[in-house]
Amino acid sequence: MVEWIEIQYPIEYGEAYKMMKSRLTGILNGTASEAVFILEHQDVYTAGISAKNDELLNCYDIPVHHTDRGGKFTYHGPGQIIIYPVINLAVNGRVKDIRNYVNNLASLVINSLKFFNITGITVQDTIGVWIDSEFGRKKIASIGVRIHKWITYHGVAINVCPDLKKFKGIIPCGDRDTIVTSISELLDQKIDLDYYKAILKQEFYKIF
């Protein structure tokens, strides 16, 4: 059974990273169960292994963490719900395929958005979840993962109601044309974060 670990306060990125890695080590050693961390971060820009220095435009006194996930720069902060699955793709009928895993994370987000009558899509040659609006295509969720001995860590960040202005300090995912959005912006209303977390938990088990 996958253990859900919900952090009730915006957590510093480095602290959450240590928790992920500790759980990964425990799974490898047979001393810990699989887990999904569900949380919000304190303001932070994270740089994946493909990030370039010129993609950080202005950090606005926001900390920058270089990390070992795939991808480039992104922003995390309050109002953005993140799930970090630390699960073994070699067990429980799962598929040992990184692309399949990333696609499943995207499907999880797309399915969760349906509860708000929002149609999420994936776009060829990109990673993440997007929406098509009257103002063009916008990104609503970012995915960045790493897999060690078929155990996953890092995960997906969904913009529920973050401060979208803070994305202006970076070139999101290395694409200057990327425009970000959130559930709250699309619906023009406040979103209950606990309600959305419950949806993610429910939909997770339909896929994983």
Swiss-Prot record:
Main location: cytoplasm
EC number(s) stated in the UniProt entry for this protein: 2.3.1.181
Single GO MF annotation: lipoyl(octanoyl) transferase activity
Pathway: Protein modification; protein lipoylation via endogenous pathway; protein N(6)-(lipoyl)lysine from octanoyl-[acyl-carrier-protein]: step 1/2
Localization annotation: Cytoplasm
Residue span(s) of domain BPL/LPL catalytic: 30-208
Keyword line: Acyltransferase, Cytoplasm, Transferase
Membrane-spanning residues: none
Marked site (Lowers pKa of active site Cys) residue numbers: 139
GO cellular component, one term: cytoplasm
Chain sites annotated for binding substrate: 69-76, 142-144, 155-157
BP terms from Gene Ontology: protein modification process
Reactions catalysed, as given in the entry: octanoyl-[ACP] + L-lysyl-[protein] = N(6)-octanoyl-L-lysyl-[protein] + holo-[ACP] + H(+)
Enzyme class, first EC level, given as a word: transferase
InterPro entries documented for this protein: aa-tRNA-synth_II/BPL/LPL (IPR045864), BPL_LPL_catalytic (IPR004143), Octanoyltransferase (IPR000544), Octanoyltransferase_CS (IPR020605)
Pfam families linked to this entry: LplA-B_cat
Domain of life: Bacteria
Residues annotated as catalytic: 173 (acyl-thioester intermediate)
Further remarks about this protein from its record: In the reaction, the free carboxyl group of octanoic acid is attached via an amide linkage to the epsilon-amino group of a specific lysine residue of lipoyl domains of lipoate-dependent enzymes.
Family: Belongs to the LipB family.
Name of the protein described by the UniProt record: Octanoyltransferase
Organism per entry: Orientia tsutsugamushi (strain Ikeda) (Rickettsia tsutsugamushi)
Gene: lipB
